């Protein structure tokens, strides 16, 4: 996707916020526990390469990604020796590509190891489905058979074992405790404990320090976003959001009563009013469901009116403004703010989706 550097719409990523979130998390971790920065999905919309650089500078000991391509992008960007784990499925035919690039892969079923011919050592993390229901082995017997298969092949290394909690971002912990018990039972069935045992995502690492094990996977909270609104008031430290989204008015005009705007003419002025056109649309991740949501203009709320277009959006202004006036879609302005949580609540989704939706057509500028 082409990045729109010649359009007045941009994202600002606060390096200091990411560093502070990492440092605050590290301060509560035992010295032996590594923090791995989760930078999948273009670092949750924050930009994978630059975010990885910031995280490394802040003390992250490795990275987690969703797909092999993301891991290879990190290697190509200069992260030559850092630990990188692919959390999602890797095709068997790509096992040697991962091995040659010293990228750790997730194995979650026995047959993936069948007839695997390796040209370099492959580091494997065994995924346990303790209750998430996506990927993973589910019994002690499976774990033992996989451990035996790996032990026989001198090119395979059982480097880690892990699971993922379905309800770590909830205050009620009974299901979490069931998952933990199941994982520990499977872990205890192994003859040799792998180098890395890891279970904690952002929510678990913030609320359940007893399960830090050897490493944590620090994702959404590295970016200053709360894993869920339910636990927002139970966090051990304040999270600092790193992402802000801005644009500028490219056209300002006064509507007369009866004038309509955008596709379908779904919005019609009932009195004289000022509106502005913004150069951002659903192709940038400002999806059509944002219609009716508000942005900030010099600290004042301005609603999005009519249907959001692929490349443009129209807002109703509290009064006349000049073309070129800055508009805050996510971020702070004149003492007021619009957050990813605000957007998520309006859209009926989660803050993860709000930032992940922001496409690479919007340039990222890194500040502080």
UniProtKB/Swiss-Prot annotation:
Q: Which GO terms describe its biological process?
A: D-alanine biosynthetic process; peptidoglycan biosynthetic process
Task: Please name the source species.
Answer: Listeria innocua serovar 6a (strain ATCC BAA-680 / CLIP 11262)
So what EC number does this one have?
Answer: 5.1.1.1
| Name of the protein this chain belongs to | Alanine racemase
Q: Does the entry feature the keyword Isomerase, yes or no?
A: yes
Leading EC class: isomerase
Q: So what family is this one in?
A: Belongs to the alanine racemase family.
Which InterPro entries does this one have? Ala_racemase, Ala_racemase/Decarboxylase_C, Ala_racemase_C, Ala_racemase_N, Ala_racemase_pyridoxalP-BS, PLP-binding_barrel
What are the UniProt keywords, alphabetically?
Isomerase, Pyridoxal phosphate
Q: Which reaction does it catalyse?
A: L-alanine = D-alanine
Source organism, top-level taxon:
Bacteria
Molecular function terms in GO for this entry?
alanine racemase activity; pyridoxal phosphate binding
**Which pathway is it part of?**
Amino-acid biosynthesis; D-alanine biosynthesis; D-alanine from L-alanine: step 1/1
A single GO CC term for this protein reads: cytosol
